[in-house]
Amino acid sequence: MRSISIYALTRNQNTDSLSKLERQLSGREYFLKIREWELQSMKALVRQLESHMTKVCSLRFFYSYQIPKLGKEFDLLQIKDDQIINIELKSGAVSEEAIRKQLMQNRYYLSVLGRSIQSYTYISSQNRLVRLTNHDHIAEADWTELCGSLQKESSDYQGNIDDLFQAELYLISPITEPARFLKKEYFLTSQQRDIQRQILKKLRISRFEYFCFTGLPGTGKTEIFEPADTEFL
């Protein structure tokens, strides 16, 4: 999947034809379902960028990217040689704690690339731009500062974004990396999270349940059971 110009994408007015255009530009393997509020939020973002900088059409983002197997999704990612800018889009009011939690989680997933990370959320209904500070707080953001970072002269990543985010980067062994495991610095695939939810649901109904499953080393068996150990032991 390639980065695209969100300026070009937002010139289109029809969400059906927009999905076709997005696939053509990004090389995505499937047609992305783009909802009307997403289109309107992105248009509002582009208008704000246009009022603070020139050549918005040259900006390239990975749009609505989901990490394979893990299912983690990002609205907009600009990836350069030395920095990553993440912009999340919201159409309505969202609590600052929810914004903070999402941006912190996003930053953690992105940190495997070893580049500086700038994290923003744009709430289109309020025309409000906020950022995650280095101290993990939410603060009002400056459009000029964001545009300056977006126009930084370092090269954009031109390759397939899937090549950067391999699921293996997020695997942690509780045996060889116990400190990171205890800090919960690991990630579960969507299938693993589903299994985990089923186990916790049954245990909350009746604690006298038995679960047995097998798997090869490195398949996340310990990570799946960790919340149950914490909550019920």
Task: Give residue ranges: language-model regions.
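Walker A/P-loop nucleotide-binding motif
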Residues: 210-223
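Post-Walker A helix-loop "phosphate-sensing" segment adjacent to the P-loop in P-loop NTPases
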Residues: 231-233
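Hydrophobic positions on the alpha1 helix immediately C-terminal to the Walker A/P-loop
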Residues: 224, 228
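Short glycine/proline-rich turn/loop motifs
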Residues: 174-182
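Short, well-ordered amphipathic alpha-helices
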Residues: 104-107, 198-199, 229
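Accessory nucleic-acid engagement/destabilization modules that flank
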Residues: 1-167
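N-terminal pre-P-loop "Q-motif" helix
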Residues: 166, 170, 184-209
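Conserved phosphate-coordination/catalytic loops
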Residues: 97-100, 186-193, 223
